[in-house]
A protein has these predicted regions:
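Helix-turn-helix/homeodomain-like alpha-helical modules used for DNA recognition
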Residues: 82-128
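DNA major-groove recognition helix of helix-turn-helix/homeodomain DNA-binding modules
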Residues: 57-72, 125-137
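Intrinsically disordered, low-complexity regulatory/linker segments
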Residues: 14, 34, 53-54, 66, ...
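Recognition helix of helix-turn-helix/homeodomain-like DNA-binding domains
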Residues: 37-53, 78, 109-123
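Short alpha-helical DNA-recognition segment
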Residues: 26-45, 97-113
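A short, Lys/Arg-rich alpha-helix, primarily the initiator
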Residues: 2-24, 75-95
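The alpha-helix within a helix-turn-helix
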Residues: 22, 33, 63, 93, ...
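Residues within the helices of the helix-turn-helix
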Residues: 19, 30, 60, 90-91, ...
Length: 137
């Protein structure tokens, strides 16, 4: 990655933003992992786009190390999770005037899945977030 004079806003993914800030700080992946208390392989997977979801507590520690806010490194999906998935799912369902069963049918999941999302017991995957929310951003 050649960061040159690039702005972090240029990067769309969490992985690219993490890599950008790490390079700006002149740190190795091992150094970041050691500072935030995770395995190097875990941190490496963060920069290799091997995941959609990033634990916010870890991202907050990484962001602090980089001297930025966690919201500077997360993408829209992880921001959705940070801002409270449960309330957002329920608000959208109520806005569309759909029952949980109708909303589930519309989205292609079970009513139990909708309940889990609305109660914060289950995390909505990025695939379903894109289907349900991405077009509204």
């Amino acid at each position: 990655m050649n960061i040159g004079n690039d702005s972090p806003a240029k990067f769309d993914t969490v992985a690219d933003r993490l890599r950008y800030y790490r390079h700006r700080k002149g740190l190795l992946q091992r150094e970041v992992a050691d500072c935030v208390g995770i395995e190097r392989t875990t941190y490496s997977s963060y920069e290799e786009e091997k995941r959609d979801y990033y634990p916010i507590d870890i991202l907050e520690r990484i962001a602090e190390l980089y001297g930025v806010k966690a919201t500077d490194v997360i993408d829209d999906y992880n921001l959705f999770l940070l801002n409270g998935q449960a309330s957002q799912v329920k608000a959208l369902r109520k806005k569309t005037k759909l029952t949980q069963a109708d909303f589930a049918n519309h989205v292609g999941v079970t009513k139990q899945q909708i309940k889990g999302w609305e109660q914060g017991r289950a995390r909505m995957t990025k695939k379903f977030w894109q289907k349900v929310f991405a077009n509204q951003l």
